[in-house]
């Protein structure tokens, strides 16, 4: 018989830097999960990623206090800020542009996020990421 799911926990943890301090410790502790076991497994799984990039993770906690987790790709906003060399997006994205990204940079981001995007082809995925860039106040070159 399959294990009974007790909870789903969604967190953003920096790649390779999971530790028992907040937000990881309290979120897992209230469900009785072994926090150090999660931290070691997460850090091992994300060691190939660039250290410090926020990585969304969905943790499934079962009634016997065991768990599984699935990592997602880094949020598009973080990758866009990194590509444009910014600390944050524009406070007024429609009127005040804060940086520029090219189509080549957008294609790199699409390749990194391919598994989490629902677009059917590269052009549609680039347009999706370009929309996120415009919403952050970035100017997009080479995409209509």
Curated annotation (Swiss-Prot):
Pfam families: Ribosomal_L11 (PF00298), Ribosomal_L11_N (PF03946)
Keyword terms, alphabetized: Methylation, Ribonucleoprotein, Ribosomal protein, RNA-binding, rRNA-binding
Cellular component per GO, a single term: cytosolic large ribosomal subunit
SUPFAM superfamilies: Ribosomal L11/L12e N-terminal domain (SSF54747), Ribosomal protein L11, C-terminal domain (SSF46906)
NCBIfam families in alphabetical order: L11_bact
Description of how the protein assembles with itself and partners: Part of the ribosomal stalk of the 50S ribosomal subunit. Interacts with L10 and the large rRNA to form the base of the stalk. L10 forms an elongated spine to which L12 dimers bind in a sequential fashion forming a multimeric L10(L12)X complex.
PANTHER family (alphabetical): 60S RIBOSOMAL PROTEIN L12, LARGE RIBOSOMAL SUBUNIT PROTEIN UL11M
Function according to Swiss-Prot or TrEMBL: Forms part of the ribosomal stalk which helps the ribosome interact with GTP-bound translation factors.
Family to which this protein belongs: Belongs to the universal ribosomal protein uL11 family.
Protein name in UniProt: Large ribosomal subunit protein uL11
